[in-house]
């Protein structure tokens, strides 16, 4: 950038303090320069996103990242003591001790991983699994030492394989891990159409399933997997990024495998590129963002195999990750999808879920020529939406 990035509202405070009577909601946002900006910059900012806070839309802390890191996602481990930052540009993980953020950081090399995407953690806090879209494999790590301890390779079978993995989700009770086949990072026109099931305890690839009713190659690009709460038998939602559809995967106890069905199509809604999903606390609402033209969708899933679209709330181009406030009042939607044209707005839309409308905008990064790639609440405000 031409000008030094200004830190707004810098204050000496402990970021892990509990919620007080003062309005405040601190979130981590990893950011990068918008395309065309000189002197490319990356970093992670702590921003107050609570519209009722006196520090709303101000950066509280800021820490730099290498300008070619291309930080993508931020994940907490099971007890939110550590934040894992994945990289599209480096074969590394940056891991932050959240009690000392950003001063305590560990850089973990993952040399066999190209284009690191999503992470899922085992319930016993012993392992993590990193999807690597560029190398078509999964890295297994020790969640205590954070050192890589294994690799799940792409597989040799034409009907059981890992290819361009992005979304990854472990169901500990079933000992099953889902991995999507999304898109070749070197060629966005080369998209997958499947999900693969892995036995987590043995790291064995069990099966691969096509999620499309179209002839192959359909290029549907399944992107994320989300197990619905309190379902018996267990079931998950999967969204197809290019296909614009939602599918379900339902556990079949007798055969110990999954059945797959399409349950919603975004065709006719004026939206495309469904990305992130999440649930409300009761588990009767499913939230789905769509990147183009940018919206936050609310589904009634009281009948989980017949999701009903209740509301579509326009946000801005590139609607992607989101955070729900601890009181369930607000959704905070990060509007940028890997800095793509028309999907790189750079703002965060604050949605009042009692009114289903945008009531405020966090644009401190956007005004600085930056765009966020992910948002996650700081540990004191964090709640799991999946």
Predicted features by range, described:
Residues 1-8:
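Bacterial N-terminal signal peptides that target proteins for export
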Residues 8, 21-22:
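A generic structural signal for short, non-catalytic loop/turn and secondary-structure boundary residues
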Residues 13, 22-386:
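Predominantly soluble domains enriched in secretory-pathway, periplasmic, or organellar proteins
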Residues 16-18:
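N-terminal signal peptide c-region/cleavage motif recognized by signal peptidases
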């Amino acid at each position: 950038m031409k000008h030094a990035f200004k830190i707004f509202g810098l204050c000496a405070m402990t970021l892990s303090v509990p919620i007080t009577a003062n309005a405040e909601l601190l979130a981590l946002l990893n950011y990068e320069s918008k395309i065309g900006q000189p002197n490319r910059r990356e970093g992670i900012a702590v921003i107050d996103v609570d519209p009722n806070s006196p520090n709303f839309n101000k950066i509280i802390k800021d820490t730099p990242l290498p300008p070619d890191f291309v930080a993508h996602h931020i994940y907490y481990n099971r007890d939110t003591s550590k934040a894992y930052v994945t990289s599209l540009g480096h074969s590394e993980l940056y891991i932050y001790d959240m009690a000392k953020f950003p001063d305590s950081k560990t850089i973990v090399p993952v040399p066999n991983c190209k284009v690191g995407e999503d992470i899922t953690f085992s319930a016993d806090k012993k392992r993590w699994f990193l999807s690597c879209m560029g190398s078509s494999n999964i890295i297994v790590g020790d969640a205590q030492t954070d050192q890589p301890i294994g690799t799940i390779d792409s597989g040799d079978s034409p009907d059981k394989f890992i290819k361009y993995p992005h979304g990854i989700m472990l169901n500990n009770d079933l000992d099953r891990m889902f991995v999507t086949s999304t898109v070749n990072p070197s060629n966005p026109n080369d998209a997958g159409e499947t999900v693969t099931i892995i036995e987590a305890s043995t790291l064995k690839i069990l099966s691969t399933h096509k999620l499309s009713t179209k002839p192959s190659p359909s290029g549907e690009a399944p992107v994320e997997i989300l197990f619905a709460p309190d379902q018996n038998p267990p079931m998950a939602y999967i969204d197809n990024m290019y296909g614009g559809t939602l599918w379900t995967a339902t556990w079949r106890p007798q055969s110990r495998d999954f059945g797959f069905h399409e349950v919603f199509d975004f065709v006719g809604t004026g939206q495309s590129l469904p990305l992130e999903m999440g649930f409300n606390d009761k588990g009767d609402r499913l939230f789905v963002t769509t990147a183009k033209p940018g919206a936050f969708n609310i589904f009634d899933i009281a009948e989980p195999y017949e999701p009903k679209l209740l509301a579509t709330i326009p946000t801005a181009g590139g609607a992607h990750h989101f955070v729900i406030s601890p009181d369930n009042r607000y959704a905070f939607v990060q509007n940028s999808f890997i800095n793509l044209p028309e999907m790189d707005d750079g703002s965060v839309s604050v949605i009042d879920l009692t009114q289903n409308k945008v009531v405020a905008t966090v644009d401190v990064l956007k005004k600085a020529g930056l765009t966020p790639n992910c948002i996650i609440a700081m540990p004191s405000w964090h709640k799991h939406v999946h």
